[in-house]
A protein has these predicted regions:
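Conserved beta-strand/loop scaffold segments within soluble protein domains that form the structured core
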Residues: 103, 114-384, 398-428
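Short acidic alpha-helix initiation/capping motifs at coil-to-helix transition points
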Residues: 12, 367-373, 391-393
Length: 428
């Protein structure tokens, strides 16, 4: 399909990104990725076709927008002395690192970081441009992002807040790379804010997390893209010996989104946990490919994902637990549950275990069901409306995942977004 090819010359590509101050090696990567994008396939999905999503209908003139006026960070719940990064459109407009952390962590916009050699240890190490058409286009048009390097033996309990604001119609190809040093501990919260209800520009978000020996990172994410948009979100992790990555994902979008959440549990004794909560509305299509790949001895990988469907939405949970040959003593578990509040909604769950080793523990479970009319009737008999009753049951259904989110601010925001979506979309 012609709409799935970037109509972009090398000359135009160079012109678009002439003001990023990026090194020549990355410009060459853009060119290679552009060539690859013409021949690489889309990821193969069950029940959905990315080829039909028109993901690459990009207005190239909006890839590098100028921000006008000051950004009032207080509007987004950020104080000037908070440990925080604020990005507006494609530009980081605020970075504050408290003095006590100044020599413990490096935080830079992605293009500034490219000019430091140590970024090459982690940037593009987990997500390769030649992986698929989606990744090739992402690296071709990468226009914003953040690089974080937490030094060895550093423990930072206070979470870094990363607020990404879009107040204009723009395609954002955002890239976050986080490298956590040996025996370090780090907490990260990202919140994508877009109140442009008529924004139709496609988006591509990629996060790479590398946890070195003994490191721990809690990565919490809220996305809330508007309903006219379509896009892809890739979150990838790599764990070395005795390290831990906790992914806490609240996908509150109204946009059609393909999510790929994959962690390679490489080191012996390392662990990855993925928790996802989502709510589908209107005609929304959402696909989650969630994978944990146990490669190290006595490694552990868990997937827990809960979804609620309203209206005519369609959600797919594709879960894969893969224990490779030689990963003895490993443990892989996954649970996918979906609750439908509409007879027109469609829910699919595809749990898979791929086990190439004997001395392991593995399990999976999936459940799809309609909201319980008897429970609704009971609550309504106590004076609640049907909508209020539905909201209580939805919160109860999602609470096992929301309660596992490690940051109170994330829990509160997710709860508010769930209530808004039920009030705006659920039929009486």
């Amino acid at each position: 399909m012609e709409n799935n090819k970037l109509k972009l010359s090398i000359k135009t590509l160079q012109s678009i990104f002439s003001n990023t101050n990026e090194p020549e090696w990355f410009l060459n990567t853009r060119k290679l990725a552009l060539y690859k994008s013409y021949t690489l396939p889309f990821p193969k999905l069950e029940s959905m076709e990315l080829e039909r999503w028109n993901l690459f209908n990009v207005d190239f003139s909006t890839l590098r927008l100028e921000n006008k006026g000051n950004v009032e960070i207080a509007e987004y719940g950020i104080n000037s002395d908070d440990f925080a990064v604020v990005q507006k459109n494609n530009t980081i407009v605020h970075i504050n690192i408290p003095e006590k952390y100044a020599d413990k962590v490096v935080i830079k916009d992605i293009f500034s970081a490219m000019n430091d050699n140590h970024i090459k240890d982690s940037f593009m190490s987990v997500v390769d441009y030649a992986e698929s058409k989606v990744t090739a286009v992402h690296y071709t048009l990468l226009n914003a992002g953040l690089f974080i390097d937490v030094k060895d033996n550093v423990v930072i309990e206070e979470p870094l807040q990363y607020i990404v604001i879009s107040d204009k119609e723009q395609s954002i190809f955002n890239h976050v790379t986080i490298q956590v040093g040996k025996n370090a501990k780090f907490n990260f919260i990202e919140n994508y804010v877009n109140n442009q209800r008529e924004d139709k520009a496609p988006f591509s978000l990629v996060s790479e997390v590398v946890a070195h020996e003994g490191a721990q990172i809690n990565y919490s994410s809220i996305t809330n893209q508007p309903g006219e948009k379509r896009g892809t979100i890739l979150r990838r992790g790599l764990t070395y010996r005795d390290s831990l990555i906790n992914w806490n994902v609240a996908a509150m979008d109204e946009a059609d989104v393909y999510h790929d959440n994959t962690t390679n549990i490489l080191g012996d004794g390392s662990e990855a946990n993925l928790k996802i909560v989502t709510l589908g509305v209107k005609e929304q299509k959402t696909y989650f490919n969630s994978e944990v790949v146990n490669q190290g001895l006595s490694s552990k990988g868990d997937i827990l994902q809960h979804g609620v469907l309203l209206d005519r939405s369609h959600i797919v949970f594709n879960g894969v637990g893969f224990i490779v040959k030689g990963a003895t003593g490993s443990n892989a578990y996954q649970s996918s549950r979906m609750l439908t509040l509409s007879s027109e909604a469609k829910a699919d769950a595809n749990p898979m275990l791929l086990i190439d080793e004997n001395d392991v523990m593995a399990g999976h479970g999936a459940s799809l069901g309609r909201i319980d009319e008897e429970q609704l009737y009971y609550l309504q008999s106590r004076g609640l409306t049907r909508k209020e009753s539905s909201r209580l049951l939805v919160h109860g259904f999602l609470s096992p995942v929301i309660s596992e989110l490690t940051v109170d601010k994330i829990k509160e925001l997710v709860t508010i977004l769930i209530d808004e979506k039920i009030n705006n979309n659920e039929r009486e």
